[in-house]
Amino acid sequence: MTNDVIQQQIEYYRARANEYEQWFYRTGRYDRGKELNQRWFDELAIVKTALHQIEPVKHILELACGTGIWTQELLQIGQQITAIDAVSEVIEINQQKLQSPKVNYQQWDLFTWEPYQQYDLVFFSFWLSHVPPIRLNSFLQKVSHSVRAGGEIFIIDSRFEPTSTAKDHILKNDESIYQVRKLNDGQKFQIVKIFYEPDELDNELVSAHFKAEVKITENYFIYAYGKKIT
């Protein structure tokens, strides 16, 4: 079942490419009204501030780069970015949006991707929660191999909060790692979605040879900054 759901995730983000940013910018089905939207953006500002505490680096690897929401932030930190995603549609949006010679785009399924070099900083946002538990260790080991000795990692993901998703989605606080997601046109896809607690994420990062500080915002986000332990 895991392989089928992973393929569904890829198809989901392919079909969602042109509406993905509605979630981030709280428009359309994700508009929760002035108060909740402002809460979302205030908490995003906290995460962005933490990201920009990182000193400038030469080369960044961004995994699951998506439509460029965070790639544009990373351009302020890195001299060069390698941006990887499994979905050509989001890579195209990212590329057209940024039009930066500093970004090298590559299309890879992150479950078959293998690092061929090391980077100063590895970044991924809203991706780890889509990694099935059976694939988590191998993925994080590959991340570790892609970070140079003493290099850095920054991760952003979702907390369990019902108002984070579309108004016609219902987040269930149960033990299932699977969720059904719906697009604007009514198409439905099954995906993996796991909400980590800070201690859980910290333990996984320690196992992958990172010493990290994991933090949460009040409602919406969990994020981690760490360095590779040699």
Task: Outline where the language-model segments fall.
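Class I (Rossmann-like) S-adenosyl-L-methionine-dependent methyltransferase catalytic domain
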Residues: M1-E55, L61-L63, T67-Q117, V131, ...
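A conserved beta-strand element that flanks and buttresses the S-adenosyl-L-methionine
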Residues: F123
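A short glycine-rich, Lys/Arg-flanked "PGG" loop and its adjoining helix->strand segment in the class I
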Residues: N137-A149
